């Protein structure tokens, strides 16, 4: 029997072995009620992705993630992945090294929270946008270095770090750009 996956990302590049996966389309658990999760499970969905919010204190973010996990468990759904927070402020490719390191420290804390949720995969944005052409080469190098650090953190919790292909001016608009 094929397993159906409720998933917010349609295509991922997994940083651990850099292979593409097409996993389907769905909805974020952060916007789903317990009734909607139960209905999804009844319809044959087996897996969900939990979106980890970057808003609030670390304790508040942790509680939201664990609440989503409890709701999924109660509905009979398994957590396949967690989507790490992303924003212009949390960009892992920024040129300012101290800002980039602060972003990596925060995302490392978020990965530890994900460890309590138990996903197989973590989804990461390789940048925000817009990115000027004159900055792109260095920002790609910064993103690749940051991905290496976060991949090791993901491995510590037993998860595979997956890089979401992003359109427009974002880094990683195709997998070759980050290889």
Task: Describe every region a protein language model picked out.
Residues 31-53, 117-118:
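Catalytic domains of carbohydrate-active enzymes, especially glycoside hydrolases
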Residues 23-27, 48-50, 79-84, 122-124, ...:
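Hydrophobic faces of well-ordered beta-strands that scaffold small-molecule active sites
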Residues 35-38, 73-74, 92-179:
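Active-site acidic/histidine proton-transfer and metal-coordination neighborhood
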Residues 50-72, 126-132:
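Glycine-rich, proline-tolerant flexible connector loops at the mouths of alpha/beta enzymes
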Residues 20-35:
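Boundary/entry segment of secreted carbohydrate-active catalytic domains
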Residues 26-30, 51-55, 84-87, 127-129, ...:
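Active-site beta-loop-alpha junctions enriched in small/polar residues
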Residues 15-19:
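C-terminal segment of classical bacterial N-terminal signal peptides
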Residues 5-14:
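Sec-dependent N-terminal signal peptides
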